[in-house]
Design a protein with these regions (language model features):
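N-terminal alpha-helical segment
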Residues: 3-4, 18, 73
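Alpha-helix C-terminal capping segments
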Residues: 22-27, 54-58, 151-156, 168
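A metal-dependent, Asp-based hydrolase signature
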Residues: 8-35
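Conserved phosphate-coupling serine/threonine residues in phosphotransfer and NTP-handling enzymes
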Residues: 70
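Conserved phosphoryl-transfer catalytic core
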Residues: 1-9
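Asp-based, Mg2+/Mn2+-dependent phosphohydrolase catalytic module
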Residues: 73-74, 78-171
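Short, acidic loop-to-helix structural element flanking the phosphoryl-transfer center
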Residues: 19, 27, 35-67, 78, ...
């Protein structure tokens, strides 16, 4: 398991392609393996699209510019975004496997702010990891913990997209 985690971290940092990662794990057909895993074992929360349509910025309407900041294998993220039709919901997509930095490293948060041309005070960071949230708080970014696992966190917490919409409307 440790070897698999190390290889996944390397793939998520962009040091290994998805194909090389899966070959090192012993899969004979890495492309088919990736597709099977992403299509059958990772699901999109049914609440996301209605949430994004309600709160996201649209032509002629105020709203949030959503940015995806993900620790992921670059090819997997691209595949999932296309599979679920998510590109239209995000102003930008920043993936650890493409930028060779990962959460909770301060560098990826600074990179994101610079790339977006935003100050920390203009942003709200929503994540399922308390460690990632604590790292952004140090930069002055407001945070919301998407907490479905009962993880300890002292700040704002939500368990679903309906609750997240309520919190964001209050900010």
């Amino acid at each position: 398991v440790l070897r698999e985690e190390q290889l996944f971290t390397r793939a998520g940092n962009g040091e290994l392609s998805s194909e090389d990662f899966l070959k090192k794990l012993g899969y004979a057909d890495p492309v088919e393996t990736m597709q099977d895993y992403l299509e059958h074992y990772l699901t999109l929360d049914a609440g996301f699209k209605p949430f994004a349509e309600k709160l996201g910025k649209r032509p002629g309407r105020e709203g949030y510019d959503f940015v995806l900041l993900s620790n992921d294998v670059a090819e997997w993220n691209t595949y999932l975004m296309e599979l679920h039709g998510l590109n239209a919901y995000f102003e930008d997509v920043i993936v650890s496997g493409q930028v060779h930095m990962r959460k909770p490293q301060e560098s990826i948060f600074r990179y994101t702010l610079d790339r977006l041309g935003c100050s920390a005070g203009e942003c709200v960071f929503v994540d399922n990891s308390a460690a990632n949230l604590r790292a952004t708080e140090k930069l002055g970014i407001r945070t919301v913990h998407f907490n479905r696992d009962g993880e300890d966190y002292e700040g704002r917490q939500v368990e679903n997209f309906r609750e997240l919409a309520e919190v964001l409307e209050e900010l």
